[in-house]
């Protein structure tokens, strides 16, 4: 009755390294009222089906509802998990479907938590584009380390804003600012590591990858940005269109925008996430190449 994998291990020379523990309820969202909903439990109505069954590949589809603690359904999740023989890489294609009137229910934050049995020692955050690339290392010391893209040029806006920071006891402290975050970050656990890769992370802002005591998180709408996933015309004009709205829409008033119908019920947002575990310590070139290949997959792939 839980959409995410509950447990996972990585084989290494006859030994098993525990990667995930009690991670099944990791598909989450937070609505505008601060309520957390998860795709877990009987009320979530989790369903399973196979889109592809071997021998070289397995594609598992899992579906269910984001449900609050009191049983209220806020949205629906459709996720496809891609497994390939001979490799520990997992690709996840996730869609959130807005089942409620978005004038009544919208969201501050949503994503996936991969809950690990221990915290990483340090986190490596990729900044800049693949052509102008650098990696920032941050020691965790029991805290969460995050990399977030808060803004990116769109329409007439030309602002870039990416941040690597540390969250401790509910307080965020920036460590380094940059124009863009690259598509991946890596948690080093000593005898193994986990890379989270998110294609088009900067361009599809606000996005976040974080590692800490709770595990690894791929955040598909980051609440740290201060923005909300809100389809009301007033919010779209002021928080996303910005100066373009002033020029094209002639600086509409709040009253005018409140009269614009903007219900996105039935729409969906879809993302690809790569979960890439590796045995051994951090090797930057190996991690970088695997993450970049995940973010730039081949256009043609033989089926088996």
Report residues per predicted region:
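Beta-strand/loop-rich accessory regions of lumenal/periplasmic or secreted enzymes
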Residues: 2-303
């Amino acid at each position: 009755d839980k959409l995410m994998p509950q447990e996972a291990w990585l084989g290494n020379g006859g030994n098993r390294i525990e990667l995930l523990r009690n991670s099944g309820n990791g598909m989450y969202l937070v609505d505008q009222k601060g309520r957390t909903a998860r795709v877990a439990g009987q009320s979530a109505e989790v369903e399973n089906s196979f889109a592809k069954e071997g021998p070289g590949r397995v594609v598992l589809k899992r579906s269910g509802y984001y449900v609050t603690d009191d049983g209220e359904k806020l949205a629906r999740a459709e996720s496809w998990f891609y497994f390939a023989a001979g490799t520990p890489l997992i690709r996840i294609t996730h869609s959130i479907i807005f089942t409620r009137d978005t004038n009544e229910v919208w969201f501050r934050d949503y994503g996936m938590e991969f809950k690990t049995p221990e915290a990483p020692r340090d986190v490596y955050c990729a900044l800049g584009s693949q052509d102008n690339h650098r990696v920032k290392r941050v020691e965790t010391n029991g805290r969460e380390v995050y990399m977030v893209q808060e803004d990116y040029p769109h329409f007439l806006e030309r602002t870039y804003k990416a941040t690597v920071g540390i969250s401790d006891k509910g307080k965020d402290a920036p460590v380094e600012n940059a124009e863009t975050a690259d598509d991946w970050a890596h948690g080093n656990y000593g005898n193994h590591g986990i890379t989270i890769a998110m294609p088009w992370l900067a361009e599809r802002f606000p996005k976040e990858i974080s590692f800490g005591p709770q595990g690894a998180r791929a955040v598909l709408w980051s609440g740290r940005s201060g923005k909300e996933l809100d389809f009301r015309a007033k919010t779209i004009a002021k928080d996303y269109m910005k100066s373009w709205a002033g020029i094209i829409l002639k600086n509409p008033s709040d009253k005018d925008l409140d009269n614009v119908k903007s219900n996105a019920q039935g729409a969906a947002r879809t993302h690809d996430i790569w979960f890439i575990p590796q045995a051994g310590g951090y090797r930057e070139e190996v991690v970088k190449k695997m993450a970049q290949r995940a973010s730039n997959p081949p256009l043609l792939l033989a089926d088996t």
